[in-house]
Amino acid sequence: MQNFVPGDHVVLSFYACGNCENCLKGVPTQCLHYAENNLSGVRPDGSAHFTENGHKVCDMFDQSSFATHTIVRERNAVKVSKNLDLRKLGPLGCGYVTGSGTVLNTLKPHPGQTIAVFGTGAVGLAAMMAGKISGCTRVIAVDINDGRLKLAKELGATQVINSKNENAVEAIKKFTNGHGVNFAVDTTGVAGVMETSIKALAQGGVSACIAVTPHHIDVDTWNDLCVDDKAVIGVNMGDSIPQIDVPRLIEFYRQGMFDFDKTEKFYKFSEINQANADSISGKTIKPILVIDEDYKFEG
C-alpha cells in the first residue's frame, strides 16, 4: 500500500489487475481478469476474503460494501477529500461512473449533438447529466415514472417523455427535427426499450446498452445497421478509471454541474428492507445505507 495512510477517506470501486494487455492500454474495465476478480465472489485462487464460523463469505467487486469493515486492494480504492460528506460518495464508484463514463469516456458527444437516456434511475440520471456537461443541445429523458422525470428535468433534461403515455420514438424525432438523436443510452435492461433506443437514433447514431436482459433483442440489420449506419455497443462500468473519474465527478459536483446527491436518501441499516422497497417502487432513486449511525459530517 503506497498511496494511502490510516484515516484516509476512500470511495471503493472495482478491481483490475493492472498487468494484462487491456489494463496496460488504460482500459481497466476490460481487464482480462475482470470477471474472476469482481464477479466470482472469491479470490482468483478460490479462497475467500472473509469467513464466518469457518464458512466462506462471498464478496462483490472484490471488496463488498454491505459491511462495517472490509479488505481491499489498492486499486479498489480512490482517495477523496475529508471536506466532503462521505455518506454521499459511495455510489460514485459504481452507478454514477457507469452512467457518466458511458457518455464522457465512450460516446464522447460534441457540443450541439443530441442524446436520449432511457431509464432515469441513478445510472440514467448520471448519463443525462454527463450529456448536459458535454454540451448536448437536446438531453432527452425517457421513463414511465413521472416523479423521476420531474427530477430529470431539475437535473438538466431539456425534454422528458413518459413512454407509458406517448410513443418515445415519435416524440424524440419531434424534438430533433425528425432526425432522431445522435446518441442513446439504455439503462433499463428491458428488451423492448433497448430496441426503442436503436429506433430513436439518427443516421450514424450510437446506442449504448449498459443494462442487461436475459432476452434477445431484434435489430434490423439492413435498415438500422447498414443503410442508416447505426451502431449498438455494450459498455462496462462506463469505460472508467475510478482514480480519474471519481475525482472528476466530485469536481463537477463542486461546480454545481453534477448534483448526484439529489438522487440520494439515507437509511439506517435496520431500514434495509424499506430502502429496497423504496428503490423498487421508484420512491427513492439511490438509497444509501448508513451503517455508522454515529458518523457526523463536519465539513
Language-model-derived ranges and their functions:
Residues 212-229, 244-247:
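Rossmann-fold NAD(P)-binding glycine/threonine-rich loop
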Residues 1-15, 19, 78-85:
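A glycine-/small-residue-rich N-terminal strand-loop-strand element
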Residues 124-125:
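N-terminal Rossmann-fold NAD(P) dinucleotide-binding loop
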Residues 205-206, 230:
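Glycine-centered, small-residue-biased loops immediately flanking beta-strands
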